[in-house]
Amino acid sequence: MSARPWIVILVWTLLIPAAALAEDQPNAAAGRPKRVLLLGQKPDSHPANTHEYMAGVRLVAKLLQNRGGLQTVVVQADNPWRNGPELLDGADGAVVFLTEGAKWVTEDADRLAAFQRLAKRGGGLTVLHWGMGTREAAPVADFVRLFGCCHGGPDRKYKVLTATITPSSSGHPVLGGIKPVEVHDEFYYALKQPVQVEKLVPLVRVSIDGDDQTVAWAWERPEGGRSFGFSGLHFHDNWKLTEYRRLVLQGVLWSVGQPIPPGGLAVDVADADLLPAPRPDSK
């Protein structure tokens, strides 16, 4: 893997510079395919097979292939990610799956402004697991205005457990074909939301300490555009679950305005697509 601070890989394996993506931005209204950025990072301090961000976003890219003509771009968005605002300005949607993402989105003023511009023009926003996280409380307010929920602050709640994830009775399009399934995962719960929020739909719940907790949601933002989030996916092996792959795929597609059949989408992948990336210290 290159040591440059950012890496952009088209799913067709064509490597292109960030400037070329930015130059395409005016074509968004001229019929070009919608472009979705899949933002991951190198491994953090968690053990192998957890927080496998790049392997996760590459799998999402695989699932999104041949879905309504979307153009999917996998990005290793390690700080300082100076080209990030350019890339976001050329995108129609973004998936955030990286370390302490709520802090990461908001800590750089230009980066936050680019996410806000993406939201303002109706772009789709998806966040997965620690991508919605911040140890500090300060980033929460700006983040929830974009994504709807945040795992943030010193009072944030999380738990590793074996439990059944249960789709809500909302009839939401993201839930097409999704059934209850038992999983072992770390879930964030009691998530922070905007002070006044409407049209935020709980999608999936898990019983934690006797209470049903929302761990996935869909939100039609008041100023236009859609946001989707799922707080699971601590363990990379959970991508092997059909229900997980379907939930994430359909959440991303819904966020960018793509139709989802009532019975859900096929999410078959090769076994090799489910493997985590080798760690630098692996033998």
Specify the residue positions occupied by each region the protein language model found.
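Helical hinge/lid and interdomain linker segments adjacent to catalytic or ligand-binding clefts
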Residues: N27, L37-L39, D44, A48-T134
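Extracellular ligand-binding/catalytic regions of CAZymes and related secreted enzymes
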Residues: D24-P33, G40, L59, N66, ...
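Bacterial N-terminal signal peptides
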Residues: I7-A18
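Catalytic beta-strand/loop cores that center a nucleophilic Ser/Cys/Thr
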Residues: G152-G224
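Active-site rim elements
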Residues: P47-N49, K159-T164, L233-T242
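Positively charged n-region of N-terminal signal peptides that target proteins for export
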Residues: M1-P5
